[in-house]
């Protein structure tokens, strides 16, 4: 149960007061650096003039406020945010070792976070799938000495299961930066994307690779409009073809000049049949080379069907001059491959060419 003082502070924080009350709010403990602290009555999130903004769709601003208060060693605000419902464990993750025992005592005899619990919290924050969650995760875990005891294999496994993209890096900090950046790009959290890119300009290649891998052509379009694309369209196609059903990214690469034949061949190597037929629908025609590649990777049914070249043709319903992301997504919303359907019908009519594994 909240104390009377804590409850009173909460009521005051939920109301906007004029600047005439600034001195009172400072004395009342509802002040953070350059402005008063507010608690949104609608979304129940906390924000202040400098530190946070209110996101009605996100649910972690209060915990983010706690982490920032811990990093600035503001004990009064730490107590206040915990009383209001912030998870004290999230704060303990960011406490310098010399202050850990003191803060555990202040928060009612809590024990330091164990390694297993640390990894569980990392999963919890990643699973929030919110802009505020991504930014909080970065704030909590990057440059965090507690992770020094976690093996690289364990950390890589946890991050891969959440991001679904292979991560590489010389340090835990770099790995975690790329991890949270990848999550922001996967879900197109624009605010988080811009925050990471502003802090890590050297990660342009990673931003581009993730946008292609996660089919995020909104971000690709932004990079193109700012003329920040740093690699060739065919190399971009290589990233787009890594993941099945990345139709929008493949289409966008083709609009930039990537060859649909190259995309078709990459899709065969990656065993991504749907991407393969999408490239044929876009106009891929070099079936002689595709047949050789399919045979080389033991995809004998594909190799056989490519002998029937007259079966395939470009899908005229895929308009080839759209560059606006939403228009591309809308066009592909009802897309099904006509060439894949023809291939399936041909196999049904000619079972003698089907190779049973």
From Swiss-Prot:
Location in or out of the cell: Host cytoplasm
Primary site of residence: host cell
GO cellular component terms attached to this protein's record: host cell cytoplasm
BP terms from Gene Ontology: symbiont-mediated suppression of host cytoplasmic pattern recognition receptor signaling pathway via inhibition of IRF3 activity; taxis
Keyword entries, A-Z: Host cytoplasm, Host-virus interaction, Inhibition of host innate immune response by virus, Inhibition of host IRF3 by virus, Inhibition of host RLR pathway by virus, Viral immunoevasion
Assembly: Interacts with host IRF3 and TRIM21; these interactions mediates degradation of IRF3 through TRIM21 and ubiquitin-meditated proteolysis.
Family affiliation: Belongs to the asfivirus MGF 360 family.
Function noted in UniProt: Plays a role in virus cell tropism, and may be required for efficient virus replication in macrophages. Also inhibits the host cGAS/STING-mediated type I interferon production by inducing host IRF3 degradation through the proteasome pathway.
Protein name (database record): Protein MGF 360-14L
Source organism of this protein record: African swine fever virus (isolate Pig/Kenya/KEN-50/1950) (ASFV)
């Amino acid at each position: 149960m909240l104390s009377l003082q804590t409850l009173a502070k909460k009521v005051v924080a939920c109301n906007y007061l004029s600047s005439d009350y600034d001195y009172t709010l400072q004395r009342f403990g509802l002040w953070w650096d350059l402005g008063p602290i507010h608690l949104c009555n609608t979304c129940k999130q906390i924000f202040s003039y400098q530190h946070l903004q209110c996101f009605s769709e996100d649910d972690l601003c209060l915990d983010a406020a706690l982490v920032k208060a811990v990093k600035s060693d503001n004990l009064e605000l730490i107590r206040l945010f915990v009383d209001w419902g912030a998870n004290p464990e999230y704060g303990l993750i960011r406490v310098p070792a010399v202050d850990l025992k003191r803060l555990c005592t202040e928060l009612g005899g809590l024990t330091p976070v164990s390694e297993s619990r640390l990894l569980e919290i990392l999963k919890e924050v990643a699973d929030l799938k919110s802009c505020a969650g991504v930014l909080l995760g970065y704030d909590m875990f990057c440059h965090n000495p507690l992770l020094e005891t976690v093996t690289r294999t364990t950390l890589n496994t946890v991050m891969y299961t959440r991001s679904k993209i292979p991560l590489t890096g010389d340090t835990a900090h770099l790995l975690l930066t790329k991890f949270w950046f990848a999550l922001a790009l996967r879900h197109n959290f624009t605010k988080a994307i811009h925050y990471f890119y502003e802090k890590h300009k050297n990660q342009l290649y990673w931003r581009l690779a993730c946008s292609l891998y996660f089919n995020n052509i909104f971000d690709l379009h932004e990079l193109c409009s700012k003329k920040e694309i740093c690699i060739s369209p065919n190399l971009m196609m290589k990233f787009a073809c890594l993941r099945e059903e990345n139709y929008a990214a493949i289409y966008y690469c083709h609009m930039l000049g990537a060859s649909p034949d190259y995309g078709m061949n990459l899709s065969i190597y990656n065993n991504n049949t749907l991407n393969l037929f999408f490239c044929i629908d876009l106009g891929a025609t070099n079936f002689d080379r595709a047949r050789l590649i399919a045979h080389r990777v033991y995809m004998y049914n594909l190799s056989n069907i490519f002998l029937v070249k007259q079966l395939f043709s470009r899908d005229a319903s895929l308009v080839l001059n759209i560059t606006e992301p939403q228009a591309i997504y809308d066009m592909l919303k009802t897309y099904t491959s006509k060439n894949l359907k023809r291939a399936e019908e041909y196999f049904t009519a000619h079972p003698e060419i089907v190779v049973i594994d």
